[in-house]
Amino acid sequence: HQFPPLIYQVASAGIEPSSISFPFRKLFHGRKDFYFRMAEVRSVFTDQKILQTSIGKISYDYLVFAAGTTTNFFGNKNVEEHAIPMKNVSEAMGLRNALLENFERALTCSSETERQELLNVVIVGGGATGVEVAGALSEMKNHVLPKDYPDMPSSLMNIYLIEAGP
């Protein structure tokens, strides 16, 4: 299990994934008559309190659905093709790695145009997560880059936050 409100901190190297991730089963250690099964639900028979799942039939007393979430690109194929979503720790680590790789490449590239492209970060979505990511990257730009990359001016990094609202 993970704590989604802090996933942006993982992406910006503010915290480690273990700070917001923990085994779901540990929440219920020592609980009697509690069983956790992760499966794909195929049918729900509420009158019989039975689920038909990818691992067979499961009876229940109380049923809690934790359906998760997916990134909505609102039909924007360009964003869908080029963006790095950030709904879970794995995606946040992918974003973190992409950022750090770009910083490393920017240090050694010979073209100023390429360097600027590597240091331009575009955040699509001005909701809570987008704003938090922009703020965390600003902190990274002002405090981490000068220490970890002293031979690369942090002023070269640009952060753009794009919102498609009305």
Language model segments and positions:
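Beta1-alpha1 glycine-rich phosphate/pyrophosphate-binding loop at the start
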Residues: H1-F34, V121, A128-P166
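FAD-binding core/adjacent interface of flavoenzyme oxidoreductases
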Residues: F34-V122, M140, L145
